[in-house]
């Protein structure tokens, strides 16, 4: 209800007079049992005592009002209403009844939740006051982001797989000369078309006089799911489908078009600076160990590891200046090798050790930590004969850490293993930041970036501990 109009002239602050000034009174101050109500009408002092007017009917019961002020909020009681400078800005109000006013605030600040814009944090206000909760949430989000980056890069690198051949496909020979030559096969580029879709494949033609391939290995190659470091087959080119083809009979079709072999690459790469050559050798051996790990999991083993039967392919969707993609193609020398119990000698360790020593001998001696680690790994492969999985873990540790400095000489095993967890979380965060910086600059990721993502996304304290133990125990 609106209040009476204010007087035309303000009263003197020291001596207010009841006879000359209008009086604003509240029935709550006269009657304690009534809540605050409307102001009374003007009356003179005499009329108040001689002829009191009848009281108006009581107003409806009002409810208390709670105000919100910065930085805290509290319930204001009638006894505590007083002027306290400085005044806080009024933000708003909401009404509560007496029962709610006695309870207190609806929720504590520590129990407040964020708005929709803060939902990706996955944290409450109480979690922000706990460093452990913040660190745990950040570590989980970094790992999730790293796995997402790894999956997307893998889809880019392996995207566009042609799939198996069907009777409705047509074929056309692109070149009369081979695009690549391995130790026991020649590769010719072939176009496979069906309606509006087409793919460039390669016909794998055995060389005259080559060793008879093992049939079990060829059956295994035809049944394998796509793997980044194993040559995949798409079917056969029927005899007579390609008139003028420089071969006879049906030949296998492979999905990836090779550029050269590892033996041909070595003839050119050994002229690079020693540091660059050693790094490239480690990346190639890492991919080879991934292929051998897959074979060992299937109960198979490669009888003879020859650089001329290891093909190199340009990875899809990556920078052309990065390392090439390695393909294991010699399935004709793959035989059945049932896996033994955990810790049994790896069937490929001696061959990997010999190949590593041969590769390191082609370049000038290097004093880098990576070169020293590779020489040590070559000796451990011959002496301990680890599995391809452990060899792959050791190569990952040599390329991206952690190094032997994390453990220290003579350090107890327990603190050393506990330090691997924080190291792994920091390393993941740094990799995500580096990839984000490069993506912001428009730089395409390389095959090396994907291999590093694969390592940090899969690594655990246990796997890193086994890799370091293989290298430096």
Swiss-Prot record:
GO cellular component: actin cytoskeleton; focal adhesion
Record-level GO BP terms: regulation of actin cytoskeleton organization; regulation of cell motility; regulation of cell shape
GO MF, one annotated term: protein kinase activity
Biased composition (Polar residues): 16-27
InterPro entries xrefs: MitoQC_Scaffold_Kinases
Residue spans of biased composition, Pro residues class: 1-14
Region (Disordered): 1-27, 42-61
Signal peptide as annotated in the record: none
Highest taxon above the source species: Eukaryota
Subunit structure: Homodimerizes. Interacts with CRK isoform CRK-II; the interaction requires PEAK3 homodimerization.
Role noted for this protein: Probable catalytically inactive kinase. Interacts with CRK-II and antagonizes CRK-II-signaling. Prevents the formation of CRK-II-dependent membrane ruffling and lamellipodia-like extensions.
Family note: Belongs to the protein kinase superfamily.
Name recorded for this polypeptide: Protein PEAK3
Gene: PEAK3
